[in-house]
Each structure stands twice: as C-alpha cells, then as structure tokens.
C-alpha cells in the first residue's frame, strides 16, 4: 500500500543518515552521551533532595533549576554558535560541565539543600550553549534534502536519553553508590567533547556565506521574537509547560519513595517510561498528523491537553 511504501521510504532515510553519514553519527552520539549525562544525575538528585527535606515542592525545584537556565540562556547559546567556533564552544561547555558534576558531588556531601540546588543549576548554566550549538552544526554535516529527517532524529534524542539515562541512573544507584555514579558521570561530558572534535568537517558557517541581514545582535533577536506573535506564543507555551511539568514530574520521586517503596530505581523506571513516550511521540505525530510545519503547530495544544489527561490518571493506578 501507499502508506507502507511511505513508511519504508522514511525508514530508509533514517537508516542512511545513521549508517552512511559518519559526521552526523558522531554528532548524534555526542548528543546522546551529553543528554545521558544530564539524566544520570537527575534521578539520584531528586532522591537526595527528597530524603533531606521530605518536601515535594522543594524536590520539584531540582527540575526547575535544571530547565530554567536552558530556557533563559538557550537563545544566547545560539548567538554564540553563530559567531564563534562551534567545536570550541562545545569543548568549553562540556569541560565545564564535567567539572561542575564534581562540584555537585562535593555539594551533596555537605547535605545543604540550597547548595545542592545551586550546583545543579550551575550545571545547566555552563551546559546551556551545548544544545543550540549542536543544533546549529546540523546543517554542516547533513545535506539539505535530509535535514528534516536529521532534525527528527536529533530532537528525539531527548526522549531516548530521558528514558535510558534516567532508567540507567535509577538502576545504577542500586549497584554502585551515588557518589561513584557522579564521578563516572563527569567523564561522559569529556567523552562527548572528544567525539565532536573527531568530526573532520568544519561545524561553523563561513562568514562569507552568511547574509548580512542575518548578522543581527542578540538584543535584536530578542526584539524580533517578541514582535512576532507566533514565535512569542511558542516561547511562552514552552516556558509555562516546563514549569508545570517540573512540579508534576517531581511527584515520581514521591510516589516511588512513599507509595511504591522503590526508591531511585522506581523513579528511574517512571522517568524511563516517560522517555520512551517522548521518543515515539515526535516521530508518530509528524508521520500521522504533521507532514508540514503548519500541521505540526496545530497539534501542540491537543498534545499538551492529552499529556495532562494521561497524568491525571496516575493517582488511580
């Protein structure tokens, strides 16, 4: 049938990107490792804060300090990616992230909740240039006709590692100590930087290829986003959704510790299940409902409502 043929054609495009494009494969692998490093920390930190405070609200701040800097500084990371060597930006960001993980390890030993939250927020601050820089480098390693599929793979990477990283983080805390997990995690960021540096192709756009009209300041970029209703609405939607999600997802830890008595392992399983959904969702939505950007925009409100509805049923499980 036509549907099966289209499905096989799309699958073939994804397969070619992952098996025949070495530069893309390396950039994607580095992204997976970095996201995995972030999520390895999240589950044990949620458990640590909840053990110290037994307060769901304070526990939710772990996810707030993780996501807020990415939202606030992400556009600045894009600004840096347009003006400086992208490999160097990634290397500096990853090196600082690895050092910050060791700083988090020290903060945990103090059992000072504010200090722990501050150190975890600092990890998001120093790591904030990585994602926009990695995104900006994508057209440098992928042909224009394959860019749509590459974007789907790239943005589904969050779901892959939210599942694998969080699940693995929860499991590893039952095998090794949390402190050992933090020490190992610091090395993942170094590994990611090394992989990116092994990419032979230049990841930075050449200045002569850029249109002068595109060379705008960071302030002008913010003003442009604020002046465009569609862009501004998407930014507000993303920000408010992240805030509400942080409060809700922190309850995974409360459920795992107080109801199911499964500790970090149970929290990791729940975050892992969420990650599987986040992996399947973008691919399924694009295939069935959003073949164009306009159609994709129309699915945002419906999917957010569906997200809330499904989480509504968790207390009845």
Predicted regions and their residues:
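MFS-fold secondary transporters
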Residues: 50, 103-107, 123, 196, ...
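Short amphipathic helix-loop junctions that connect adjacent transmembrane helices
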Residues: 43-56, 250-265
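Juxtamembrane intracellular "pre-TM" segments in multi-pass secondary transporters
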Residues: 7-24, 202-236
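C-terminal transmembrane bundle of multi-pass solute transporters/carriers
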Residues: 72, 89, 103, 114, ...
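Small-residue-rich packing faces within the transmembrane alpha-helices of Major Facilitator Superfamily
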Residues: 98-99, 105, 186-193, 305-309
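Substrate-agnostic recognition of the 12-TM MFS/MFS-like secondary transporter fold
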Residues: 25-43, 63-79, 85-99, 115-174, ...
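Transmembrane alpha-helix termini and helix-breaking/packing motifs in multi-pass membrane transporters
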Residues: 46-52, 105-106, 164-184, 258-259
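Helix-loop junctions on the cytosolic side of multi-pass membrane transporters
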Residues: 136, 140, 182-212
């Amino acid at each position: 049938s036509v549907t099966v043929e289209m499905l096989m054609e799309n699958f073939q495009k994804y397969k070619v990107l992952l098996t025949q494009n070495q530069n893309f494969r390396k950039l994607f692998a580095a992204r997976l490792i970095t996201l995995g490093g972030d999520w390895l920390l999240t589950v044990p930190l949620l458990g640590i804060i909840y053990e110290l405070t037994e307060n769901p609200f304070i526990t939710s701040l772990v996810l707030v300090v993780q996501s807020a800097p990415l939202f606030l500084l992400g556009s600045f990371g894009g600004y840096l990616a347009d003006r400086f060597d992208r490999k160097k930006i990634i290397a500096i960001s990853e090196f600082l992230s690895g050092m910050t993980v060791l700083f988090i390890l020290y903060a945990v030993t103090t059992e000072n909740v504010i200090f722990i939250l501050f150190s975890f927020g600092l990890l998001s601050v120093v790591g904030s240039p990585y994602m926009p820089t990695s995104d900006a480098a994508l057209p440098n390693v992928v042909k224009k006709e394959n860019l749509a599929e590459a974007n789907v793979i790239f943005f589904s990477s969050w779901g892959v590692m939210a599942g694998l990283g969080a699940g693995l983080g929860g499991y590893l805390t039952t095998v090794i100590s949390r402190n050992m997990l933090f020490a190992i995690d610091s090395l993942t960021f170094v590994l990611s930087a090394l992989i990116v540096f092994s990419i032979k192709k230049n990841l930075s756009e050449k200045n002569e290829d850029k249109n002068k009209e595109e060379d705008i300041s960071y302030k002008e970029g913010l003003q442009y986003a604020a002046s465009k209703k569609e862009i501004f609405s998407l930014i507000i939607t993303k920000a408010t959704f992240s805030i509400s999600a942080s409060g809700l997802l922190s309850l995974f830890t409360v459920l795992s510790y107080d109801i199911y008595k499964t500790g970090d392992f149970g929290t990791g399983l729940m975050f892992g299940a969420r990650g599987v959904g986040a992996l399947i969702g973008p691919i399924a939505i694009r295939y069935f409902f959003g073949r164009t950007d306009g159609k994709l925009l129309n699915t945002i409100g419906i999917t957010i409502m569906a997200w809330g509805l499904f989480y509504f049923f968790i207390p009845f499980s």
